[in-house]
């Protein structure tokens, strides 16, 4: 009887310790970064939702909303005789959205922070799980840059969960076919697509939050070619989008999927099930065919 009571008491104590430990950790995570490399939080925190985000970044909020924006938390850090540092932490709808937001402007070298990162010009950008972070200073210098990186590492450590990259990104051909480093963009909007590669003012490919697209650049012998891979919710949606694209972008194709355009380069498009593949600006018809077939083989 005593042993049974002792076991119940022990179980209760272990449970209580576990509860308090989890609660303490969760509270610490909510507090976020307090200090990094001598820069201290000014104890002011700003939060924005999908409506108030426009107050913080008028004109740029649409980019974040397209990628399933949920919440933004902003903190500033100060150190005497040094420029302030701003930490922006965006909570997105999914890890795929966080990756997409990161990929849209990616251009600098990786910093080894989170699941994907870049650092250049004093700006650190990274993603981890469903979070995207942007950390920057209002000035330059080795000490400031070191602090920005330290703050990024500390922030990434607070984000406990990781998440998958979009599976569609793995379906594009790699460096064997000339894939340009850091050129793959994960897109959810024709407006964003046009900002990276203009196709048409109208949404002729029927892109939306229900579709996903990857735009990537390939280079061979200094010739640049763009590959666009789009997955639709179903075969009908893919077929409708393909027909819309061919009618608007390649009206003179005459039933063919390969056309020489006015710039003397080749564009090729094909639908395969729920996927549409388009190759833009290939130097030769054979190059367009090779890249498109390589993509088909990975589906």
Where are the predicted features?
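Positively charged n-region of N-terminal signal peptides that target proteins for export
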Residues: 1-11
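Soluble, non-membrane globular domain cores that form compact, hydrophobic packing
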Residues: 11-299
